[in-house]
Each structure stands twice: as structure tokens, then as C-alpha cells.
Amino acid sequence: MHLSPQEKDKLLIVTAALLAERRLNRGLKLNHPEAVAWLSFLVLEGARDGKSVAELMQEGTTWLSRNQVMDGIPELVQEVQIEAVFPDGTKLVTLHDPIR
């Protein structure tokens, strides 16, 4: 199997997001890499499901709360940017202050 660097990056995000999901389900708080991976994964999946950039930017602020991440993480994650594939091409999605 031959994967491009972008495909490898997306697989790494998915792997980290699956770990984050398991930890959330166990009631554990996410650290910085886990929180970013989880948010990035939800953007990628939302784009795949046909949601618009605007919808994802709006929904992205509801996916994680301060109670689900370790102390100080909301201040560290002020912005998440991810390139996602939409039906009409690849677009950059930016989540501003996604952990509230």
C-alpha cells in the first residue's frame, strides 16, 4: 500500500482520535494532542458527510468542553486548522476557540 504524506497524516489523526474517543468514553480528560486530534477528526468526518465549512466552524465549538480536557488545554488550543476534502474540493477549516 502506497500512501501520500497527506494520507499518512490523516491516518495518524484518526488513530489519535480513536484513542481520544476511548479515553473520553472512560471519563478521562484529554491532553493537548488528543484534543486537537479529536477536533480534527470530527472536521474530516463532517466534511466527508457533506457538511459545509460554515457548519463545521459553528459545530466545532460544541464538540469539547472545558470539563473534558486537562487544565490549561483550552488556552493552548485557541485555533485548529485542518484541510478537509469536501464534495467540491479541498478546503481549510479553522476552528476558533473550539474548547469552551
From Swiss-Prot:
GO terms for biological process: urea catabolic process. InterPro entries: Urease_gamma, Urease_gamma/gamma-beta_su, Urease_gamma_sf, Urease_subunit. CDD domains: Urease_gamma. Keywords: Cytoplasm, Hydrolase. It is found in: Cytoplasm. Optimum temperature is 45 degrees Celsius. One of its GO terms (molecular function) is nickel cation binding. GO terms for cellular component: cytoplasm. It catalyses: urea + 2 H2O + H(+) = hydrogencarbonate + 2 NH4(+). Pathway: Nitrogen metabolism; urea degradation; CO(2) and NH(3) from urea (urease route): step 1/1. Optimum pH is 8.6. Heterotrimer of UreA (gamma), UreB (beta) and UreC (alpha) subunits. Three heterotrimers associate to form the active enzyme. This is Urease subunit gamma. The gene is ureA.
